[in-house]
């Protein structure tokens, strides 16, 4: 909440609000708009007519709950019913029925959809807004060339360009261009009408040659010329109706449909008054665009900034779902048309219900959620990740850009992003700047523009009014950007404030200010707003921090941060992770899996999440926070979820840290930790892995789930029950059988036993053999079985196989190789775990928990971690929690430093520990070496920052290979952990070994351990018998492969082996 001196109050909007508003807009408006477009369908003889009555459409409440949909791998959807009528024109009879159109996936309370049991989210896309844009580019001679680009609603483009002779051309394809006169004439105007509707008729007449007059002599000639240039067809095409239809379909429908937004933009840019419902490009638009282009050539008018947000539009979840619904209705129209014709051909009497099938709508949405680039699997690593994922905005996707073609200018921060798109939070790598995050207060307007709130400053009225402005409106106001404290307390007349005006940042007098920003977090996304003292960090490190907070693993024992920003509670509540009371009442029963609440004559049972797996294998679990018999109010937290404590976000731990070098173990961002973090389960987390197997019906018969698996040791089958499925609560190790399965197969004659052959010869009995295809626990999967699910799809055919899933819980302590990070981009890998007695200790005898490298601070310029570190120490000693808003220097100079030093001073005073704040080196203290007891030479910064354990864990990455598979072509080990691959000794590694002269090791690496087949086979025998390994006498397989490839190019390569005894060259064929 934000209060100001004038009594104005503003609430931070719900972080899922953009998703909810988009889906509601689709249900309320989008469905009806598309249904109204559904045409009346007639048969060929025009005797029967089918139509939908849109006014009576209804969505039915889902038949299953969200939790059941996830558990059974179903889609959480609603059935759509519409009234449809079949009219017989001869008798004027009409049959009306309620028709089931299909299933529409619904949005749940998290702003996500559940499709086939998987949480999916649709992210917002930023596209170029349809309309016309003028720009200037230098050609190869250094002369400015002016162009006007008309962008359609579907992304198609028509470019108008003016050459040095002031002739205007329309570029209809990459290579071909035609005269503006031919295009206007093809669209239906004659020469007289063209000259009457332009401002510069003499320029148009100046490039009208005899050849041009012939082309625009009639509309047919103009269409033929246009068709010839557009399709690049030679010869002389003949005018026909089919030619007009083809041109209409390929050009005018794809490149000339502006849509409602495009029509508004065209009218505004070209000063036209064409009705808004006329959404196609008209000849009048083309001529007005040409007039403006001529004006640009003569220095009149302004060029457009293509990267300004006023020239962009947001394609939200509503637009994407509506597009898919329209596509499904087109498919349904084709189905109905074909069914009517088929019924009449077979002399059947159709009914509305028989004509319509639900398949087009259901399959369209399933393919959209499963295959569309903007529909993504919800990242559920922690509560913050769930919230941030739904607020992403992407330039990528259909109709947008690609990571390889986007320019630096598009990726860069634009002044119009202020208060709308976060300047910090973006992805790292090839998509940097293309995938951003919406700011906290940004919202999407009705025409797809991003709006940001401001307070209006009025001299007449003392009331504060909040305005939401689109990017094209706030350019014309003087907006005060800083010094919010002075603005709240009533500004003096002579005050000078920083402000923003027309994409420039200025310093102006207070009287000129018309609007002001009202919230410190207004410019940042959620991830960046959770970084305390963000103003003291370099932007690159803040970017890393906002990304790494989304990678934090929920810990078994979470802890609230001592130093925060105040947004932690709202992030946790909006994520849906904690259980919140929807009504007030009294707790009458609590359990580990449910809470029963009674009040006002009703009783509500609230189920809790128990050991649920997220798609990143983290554990989602809720713990009861209320006691039986207590009265609670609406909105109170009943149970904490993963990474929440008391309804606040808790991603990490407050750990005692020292910034100092220690025997080189924290070189290059390595981190030294105490064994206390392991033994006391400080950074212990739970992970749930899912393993599944399917049973199919093969050509030899159905696969069987059984515990009777031949040729396997009993030890591997010890955890199976009588059905062949692993028992709940079993502890399983690598290689154990989780599901016993046999697949029937037809064996070869030679593999039959003698008694089987006798049975076949005498009785004709076909003996089938089965192959063992059990589900085995892979490497690194050891743990406790907590759930087994047997999912049987409807139908039971071979296309709907039965699926068995086994869920295994792992407990992971922190270990060497795990990645930890702070909230300022300070990340590192655990390099060594020291005994507590060897860790450096403070003057009160307490050992530190972590040792960071101090050299990681000055070069990275993330000084915010030092402020947080010292303030966290003061907070832990004083038992206080701090919530620090960003840019607190707006209150006074050096506000952050003053706050930290004053709290440290008070902590030292109250705890009678003078070492907490030493005036000679404030924030630093003398500490002692735990091994010797001697003090270190220099005072060291110590404190309690908030440190996170990230999902990049060594248990998921470490891999070793003793034996494994080889590639068939090169005979070298496969690549990657998943394939049990090995590391390849490449060209540069060979150079390094050559540099040390290790010839024997080099020979082993390139022959026995790699791709020399014969030598590889001889190694085992010679090792067992104790003989020396013979040296290979021929070339390895990769060299033979090179020779074969050269042979395919008609090049014969021969090689020679030099004898060690007499160095005679023995010539040998490859």
Curated annotation (Swiss-Prot):
Gene3D superfamilies (UniProt xref): 2.40.50.100, 2.40.50.150, 3.90.1100.10, DNA-directed RNA polymerase, beta subunit, external 1 domain, DNA-directed RNA polymerase, subunit 2, domain 6, RNA polymerase alpha subunit dimerisation domain, RNA polymerase Rpb2, domain 2
GO cellular component: chloroplast; DNA-directed RNA polymerase complex; mitochondrion
Subunit structure: In plastids the minimal PEP RNA polymerase catalytic core is composed of four subunits: alpha, beta, beta', and beta''. When a (nuclear-encoded) sigma factor is associated with the core the holoenzyme is formed, which can initiate transcription.
Catalyzed reaction equations: RNA(n) + a ribonucleoside 5'-triphosphate = RNA(n+1) + diphosphate
Keyword vocabulary terms for this entry: Chloroplast, DNA-directed RNA polymerase, Nucleotidyltransferase, Plastid, Transcription, Transferase
Name recorded for this polypeptide: DNA-directed RNA polymerase subunit beta
Enzyme Commission code: 2.7.7.6
Subcellular location field: Plastid, Chloroplast
Highest taxon above the source species: Eukaryota
Annotated source species: Populus alba (White poplar)
Family (UniProt): Belongs to the RNA polymerase beta chain family.
GO molecular function, one term: DNA binding
GO terms, biological process: DNA-templated transcription
Annotated InterPro entries: DNA-dir_RNA_pol_bsu_ext_1_sf, DNA-dir_RNA_pol_su2, DNA-dir_RNAP_su2_dom, DNA-dir_RNAP_su2_hyb_sf, RNA_pol_bsu_bac, RNA_pol_bsu_CS, RNA_pol_Rpb2_2, RNA_pol_Rpb2_2_sf
Native organism taxonomy: Eukaryota, Viridiplantae, Streptophyta, Embryophyta, Tracheophyta
Pfam families assigned: RNA_pol_Rpb2_2 (PF04561), RNA_pol_Rpb2_3 (PF04565), RNA_pol_Rpb2_6 (PF00562), RNA_pol_Rpb2_7 (PF04560)
Gene designation per UniProt: rpoB
Function per UniProt: DNA-dependent RNA polymerase catalyzes the transcription of DNA into RNA using the four ribonucleoside triphosphates as substrates.
NCBIfam families attached to this UniProt entry: PRK00405.1
PANTHER family reported for this sequence: DNA-DIRECTED RNA POLYMERASE I SUBUNIT 2 (PTHR20856)
Keyword Ion transport attached: no
């Amino acid at each position: 909440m934000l209060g100001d001196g004038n009594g104005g109050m503003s609430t931070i909007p719900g972080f899922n609000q953009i998703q909810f508003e988009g889906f509601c807009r689709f249900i309320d408006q989008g469905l009806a708009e598309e249904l109204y477009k559904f045409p009346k369908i007639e048969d060929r003889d025009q005797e029967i007519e089918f139509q939908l009555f849109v006014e009576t459409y209804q969505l039915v409440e889902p038949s299953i709950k969200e939790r059941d949909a996830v558990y059974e791998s179903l889609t959480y959807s609603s059935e759509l019913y519409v009234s449809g009528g079949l009219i017989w024109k001869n008798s004027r009879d009409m049959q009306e029925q309620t028709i089931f159109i299909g299933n529409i996936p619904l949005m749940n309370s998290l702003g996500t959809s559940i499709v086939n049991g998987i949480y999916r989210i649709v992210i917002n896309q930023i596209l170029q807004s349809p309309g016309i844009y003028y720009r200037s580019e230098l050609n190869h001679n250094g002369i400015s060339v002016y162009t006007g680009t008309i962008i359609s609603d579907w992304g198609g483009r028509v470019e108008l360009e003016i050459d040095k002779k002031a002739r205007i051309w329309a570029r209809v394809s990459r290579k071909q261009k035609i005269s503006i006169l031919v295009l206007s004439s093809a669209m239906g105007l004659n020469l007289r009408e063209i000259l009457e509707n332009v401002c510069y008729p003499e320029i148009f007449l100046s490039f009208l040659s005899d050849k041009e007059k012939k082309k625009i002599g009639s509309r047919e000639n103009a269409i033929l010329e246009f068709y010839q240039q557009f399709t690049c067809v030679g010869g002389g095409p003949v005018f026909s109706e089919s030619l007009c239809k083809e041109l209409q379909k390929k050009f005018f429908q794809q490149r000339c449909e502006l849509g409602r937004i495009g029509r508004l933009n065209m009218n505004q840019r070209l000063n036209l008054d064409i009705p808004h419902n006329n959404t196609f490009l008209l000849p009048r638009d083309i001529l007005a665009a040409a007039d403006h282009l001529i004006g640009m050539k003569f220095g009149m008018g302004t060029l457009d900034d293509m990267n300004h947000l006023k020239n962009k539009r947001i394609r939200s979840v509503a637009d994407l779902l509506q597009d898919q619904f329209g596509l499904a209705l087109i498919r349904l129209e084709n189905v109905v048309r074909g069914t009517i014709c088929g019924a009449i051909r077979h002399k059947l009497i159709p009914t509305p219900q028989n004509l319509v099938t639900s398949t087009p709508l259901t399959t369209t949405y399933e393919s959209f959620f499963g295959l569309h680039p903007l529909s993504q699997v919800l990242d559920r690593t922690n509560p913050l990740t769930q919230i941030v994922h739904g607020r992403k905005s992407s330039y990528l996707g259909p109709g947008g850009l690609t990571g390889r073609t986007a320019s630096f200018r598009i990726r860069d921060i634009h002044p119009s992003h202020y208060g709308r798109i976060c300047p910090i939070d973006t992805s790292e790598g090839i998509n940097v700047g293309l995938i951003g995050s919406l700011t906290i207060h940004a919202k999407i307007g009705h025409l797809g523009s991003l709006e940001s709130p401001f307070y209006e400053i009025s001299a007449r009225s003392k009331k504060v009014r909040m305005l939401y402005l689109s990017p094209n409106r706030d350019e014309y106001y003087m907006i005060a950007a800083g010094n919010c404290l002075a603005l709240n307390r009533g500004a003096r007349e002579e005050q000078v404030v920083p402000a923003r005006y027309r994409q420039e940042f200025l310093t102006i007098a207070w009287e000129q200010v018309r609007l002001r920003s009202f919230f410190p977090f207004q410019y940042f996304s959620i991830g960046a707003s959770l970084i305390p003292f963000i103003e003291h960090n370099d932007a690159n490190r803040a970017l890393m921090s906002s990304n790494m907070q989304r990678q934090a693993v929920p810990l078994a024992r979470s802890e609230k941060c001592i130093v925060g920003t105040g947004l932690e509670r709202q992030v946790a509540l909006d994520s849906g992770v904690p259980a919140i009371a929807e009504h007030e009442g009294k707790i009458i029963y609590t359990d580990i899996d449910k809470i029963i609440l009674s009040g006002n004559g009703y009783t509500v049972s609230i189920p809790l999440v128990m050991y649920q797996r997220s798609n990143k294998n983290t554990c989602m679990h809720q713990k009861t926070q209320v006691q039986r018999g207590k009265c609670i109010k609406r909105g109170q937290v009943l149970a904490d979820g993963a990474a929440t404590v008391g309804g606040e976000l808790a991603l990490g731990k407050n750990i005692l840290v020292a910034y100092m070098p220690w025997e080189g173990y924290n070189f290059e961002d390595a981190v030294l930790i105490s064994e206390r973090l392991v033994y006391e389960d400080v950074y212990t987390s739970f992970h749930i892995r899912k393993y599944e197997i399917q049973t199919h019906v093969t050509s030899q018969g159905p696969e069987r789930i059984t515990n009777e698996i031949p040729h396997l040791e009993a030890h591997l089958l010890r955890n199976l029950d009588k059905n062949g499925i692993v028992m709940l609560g079993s502890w399983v190790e690598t290689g154990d059988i989780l599901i016993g399965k046999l697949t029937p197969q037809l064996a070869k004659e030679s593999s039959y036993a003698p008694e089987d052959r006798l049975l076949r010869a005498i009785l004709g009995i076909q003996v089938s053999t089965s192959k063992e295809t059990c589900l085995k626990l892979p490497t690194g999967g050891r743990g406790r079985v907590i759930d087994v699910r047997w999912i049987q799809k409807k139908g039971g055919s071979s296309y709907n196989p039965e699926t068995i899933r086994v869920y295994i819980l792992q407990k992971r302590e922190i270990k060497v190789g795990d990645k930890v990070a702070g909230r300022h981009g300070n990340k590192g890998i655990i390099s060594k775990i020291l005994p507590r007695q060897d860790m450096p200790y403070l003057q009160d005898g307490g050992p530190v928990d972590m040792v960071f490298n101090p050299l990681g601070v000055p070069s990275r310029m993330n000084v915010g971690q030092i402020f947080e570190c010292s303030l966290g120490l003061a907070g832990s000693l004083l038992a206080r929690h701090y919530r620090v808003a960003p840019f607190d220097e707006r209150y006074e100079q050096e506000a952050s430093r003053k706050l930290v030093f004053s709290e440290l001073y008070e902590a030292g005073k109250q705890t009678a520990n003078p070492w907490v704040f030493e005036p000679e080196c404030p924030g630093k203290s003398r500490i002692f070496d735990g091994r010797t007891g001697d003090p270190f030479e220099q005072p060291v910064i110590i404190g309690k920052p908030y440190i996170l354990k990230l999902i990049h864990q060594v248990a998921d990455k470490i891999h070793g290979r003793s034996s494994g598979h080889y590639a068939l072509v090169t005979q070298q080990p496969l690549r990657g952990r998943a394939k049990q691959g090995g590391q390849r000794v490449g060209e540069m590694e060979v150079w390094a070994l050559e540099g040390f002269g290790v010839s024997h090791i080099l020979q082993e690496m390139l022959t026995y351990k790699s791709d020399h087949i014969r030598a590889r086979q001889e190694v085992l025998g010679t090792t067992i018998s104790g003989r020396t390994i013979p040296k290979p006498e021929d070339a390895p397989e990769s060299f033979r492969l090179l020779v074969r490839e050269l042979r395919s190019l008609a090049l014969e390569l021969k090689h020679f082996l030099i004898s060690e005894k007499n160095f005679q060259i023995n010539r040998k064929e490859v």
